[in-house]
Amino acid sequence: MALAYIGLGSNLSDNVDGHIVAPRAQLNKALDSLSLHRHTSLVTVSSFYQTPPIGPGEQADYINAAAKLETKLTPLQLLDYLQSIEQQQGRVRTIRWGARTLDLDILLYN
């Protein structure tokens, strides 16, 4: 199994089935999705941190965290899975460095 470190961030709420999902809940939901994949094991998760945004316009602060995974997925397979989680949680890619419901990045792989 490979080790992978994932960066997580969110500064937008999303409306899911009539319920508002706040940024902290977005991260928890993404961590749940990561732990459910049969080829991925969630090893540990950092604390959550509130950080100011870098980018265009007025944006809310981000909630950020990092997670350590063990995975049998290749880097490309892992990236595809992370992007599918982002899409499931309402991520729309419009403005570079803009506000987002969820941002998942591979920080380090093996």
Language-model-detected regions and their locations in the chain:
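Core catalytic alpha/beta fold that binds nucleotide/phospho-ligands
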Residues: M1-N110
